[in-house]
Swiss-Prot record:
Record keywords, A-Z: Acetylation, DNA-binding, Isopeptide bond, Metal-binding, Nucleus, Phosphoprotein, Repeat, Transcription, Transcription regulation, Ubl conjugation, Zinc, Zinc-finger
Gene3D superfamilies in the cross-refs: Classic Zinc Finger
Chain ranges of zinc fingers (C2H2-type): 22-44, 84-106, 112-134, 140-162, 168-190, 196-218, 224-246, 252-274, 280-302, 308-330, 336-358, 364-386, 392-414, 516-538, 544-566, 572-594
Protein name listed in UniProt: Zinc finger protein 668
Coiled coil: none
Length: 619
């Protein structure tokens, strides 16, 4: 919508005398001030272009009076030619200044800054309307939240966020909108008017400002800074939503459960949890989603598109948030700190998961065996032991696995064999220590392994005083794939090759090609454990030195763990005795030395189910 400002010597009937007048170029109505002109501009239908204001030379007083007397302002305006056509959209204008003013809506140029807050505007009349907000001229106040507006039309658009009203429906796709300007922008997408494309990922936009916002997701630029907490954002709208958290403002409240939200989109997604509505359908797999962001993220998984690129290491990501989190690995930024042990984390959910270690909470309990877990994902993996579900399948050989990490380890055997030009050698289960009498029938069990020693009784879930063969002697099991069969699912499986395969497995294990390559000298190792042991000889791969003793580490986590040896901090306390430990893994090892009540699930139970070992009590 375009509104022109004109000089007038006499006011229109019913208005105060004013030196400037504002005229609508769609219907040629005139107004005595900018706010009234802007309110009127919003009343025109969605077919008009986005709100623009052009300042032109004033008409003579006689011509203005003649037009008012004739009452034929609309016809007179429509009869004039519009020789200045926009090359980016179908609009045309009578004068070159009007076209230049309109062109700012495509380029995103905002040459008129607010002297109070620095906000910039495309047109001077929009700046004048904005300045009224600094002067306190906000007569239109929302009844549902503290927001106020200088124009009634803006208040009506805002109130639709509370009521859920979306009167502007797209005839092509059915999508509806509350704001007519957003609806007009959406209509351009159907017209194919997306002249601004991203050079990195090819995504196209109808407006230059939208492209600029998108480009920040690639560059990581976040120019909008919160004055309260220092957090930065790539969009001003994101900063506005964030600032509501500090102000404790949640203007969007669910009528069903009373929960409040800072953003309209979050409120709308929440509403679907009550209705069960999932309007976003994936055409490839039929999966449905309740919010568009989850749907877009799911689609990228099908397409394999990872448009967000890390400049330092070359890694690609599907989401800008994932890239932002990954960048903390390079910068060392770990903003989430545990208040009990001073450990820091890259992501908030890592801190929440870590906090369960101190609290001892395990809210997710297995209904089959009673074992409890700190995370729902761990319970889901554990439940597959009971159900026999193995949802992760190898595309090369058809083998199935309980967890995705096991599938990834298995797939490496195919890749290494293809690189060596030979079929994969027969896999072995080697070096797996099991007590005598537990290996099951039909398994080839050689003599007891020398030097293994007696296992701690707690590792097998047995009290020290309980005798029997299960707590006295261990053997090394070396059996080929045909000996490993799950009795529940009937799927044969073996873990990847372990250390010592050449000693027990015979000649076939020697034929297996190396899998892991040193980053520094390209020397190959058959296992990741051997590779890590070898890489310790390269000081270049251990860039994190201890300032107290000079010992260096390959990662920051190893340095933090080592630093505790110089201090008295031992954050992990045993719930059964007063002992404390430097790490959670040391605590778990120690807990196994305590007697375990009969029938308590132990870490060996999933392994026993995998190998088809019958569940028996201690002898």
């Amino acid at each position: 919508m375009e509104v022109e400002a004109a000089e007038a010597r006499s006011p229109a009937p019913g208005y105060k005398r004013s030196g400037r007048r504002y005229k609508c170029l769609s219907c040629t109505k005139t107004f005595p001030n900018a706010p009234r002109a802007a309110r009127h501009a919003a009343t025109h239908g969605p077919a008009d272009c986005s709100e623009e204001v052009a300042e032109v030379k004033p008409k003579p007083e006689t011509e203005a009076k003649a037009e008012e007397a004739s009452g034929d302002k609309v016809a007179g305006s429509a009869a004039k030619p519009r020789p200045y056509a926009c090359p980016l959209c179908p609009k045309a204008y009578k004068t070159a200044p009007e076209l230049r003013s309109h062109g700012r809506s495509h380029t995103g140029e905002k040459p008129f800054p607010c002297p109070e807050c620095g906000r910039r505007f495309m047109q001077p009349v929009c700046l004048r309307v904005h300045l009224a907000s600094h002067a306190g001229e906000l007569p239109f106040r929302c009844a549902h939240c503290p927001k106020a507006y200088g124009a009634l039309s803006k208040l009506k658009i805002h109130q639709r966020g509370h009521t859920g009203e979306r009167p502007y429906a797209c005839a092509d796709c059915g999508k509806s909108f509350a704001d007519p300007s957003v609806f007009r922008k959406h209509r351009r997408t159907h017209a194919g008017l997306r002249p601004y494309s991203c050079e990195r990922c090819g995504k196209a936009y109808a407006e230059l400002k939208d492209l600029r916002n998108h480009e920040r997701s690639h560059t990581g630029e976040r120019p909008f800074l919160c004055s309260e907490c220092g957090k930065s954002f790539s969009r001003s709208s994101s900063l506005t939503c964030h600032q509501r958290i500090h102000a404790a403002q949640k203007p969007y409240r669910c009528p069903a459960c009373g929960k409040g939200f800072t953003q309209l989109s979050s409120y709308q997604s929440h509403e679907r949890t009550h209705s069960g509505e999932k309007p976003f359908l994936c055409p490839r797999c039929g999966r449905m989603f309740s919010d568009p962001s989850s749907f877009r993220r799911h689609q990228r998984a099908h397409e394999g598109v990872k448009p967000y690129h890390c400049e330092k290491c070359g890694k690609d990501f599907r989401q800008p948030a994932d890239l932002a989190m990954h960048r903390r690995v390079h910068t060392g930024d770990r903003p989430f700190k545990c208040l009990q042990c001073d450990k820091t984390f890259v992501a908030s959910w890592d801190l929440k998961r870590h906090a369960l270690v101190h609290s001892g909470q395990r809210p997710f309990r297995c209904e089959e065996c009673g074992r409890a877990f700190a995370e729902r994902a761990s319970l889901t993996k554990h439940s597959r032991v009971h159900s026999g579900e193995r949802p992760f399948h190898c595309n090369a050989c058809g083998k199935s696995f309980v967890v995705s990490s096991s599938l990834r380890k298995h797939e490496r055997t195919h890749r290494s064999s293809e690189a060596a030009g030979a079929p994969p050698a027969q896999e072995l289960v080697v070096g797996l220590a099991l007590p005598v009498g537990v290996a099951g029938e039909g398994s080839a069990t050689p003599a007891a392994g020398a030097g293994l020693g007696d296992p701690p009784a707690g590792l097998l879930g047995l009290p020290p005083e309980s005798g029997g063969v299960m707590a006295t002697q261990w053997q090394v099991v070396g059996m080929t794939v045909e000996h490993v069969e799950c009795q529940d699912a009937g799927v044969r499986e073996a873990p990847g090759p372990l250390e010592g395969a050449g000693e027990v497995g015979g000649e076939e294990a020697d034929e297996k090609p190396p899998q892991f390559v040193c980053r520094e000298c390209k020397e190959t190792s058959s296992t990741m454990t051997l590779l890590r042991r070898h890489e310790r000889s390269h000081p270049e791969l251990r860039p994190f030195p201890c300032t107290q003793c000079g010992k260096s580490f390959s990662d920051r986590a190893g340095l933090r763990k080592h630093s505790r040896t110089h201090s008295s901090v031992r954050p992990y306390t045993c719930p059964h005795c007063p002992k404390a430990f430097l790490s959670a893994s040391d605590l778990r090892k120690h807990e196994r030395t305590h007697p375990v009540p009969m029938g308590t699930p132990t870490p060996l139970e999933p392994l026993a189910a995998l190998l088809g070992i019958p569940e028996e009590g201690p002898a």
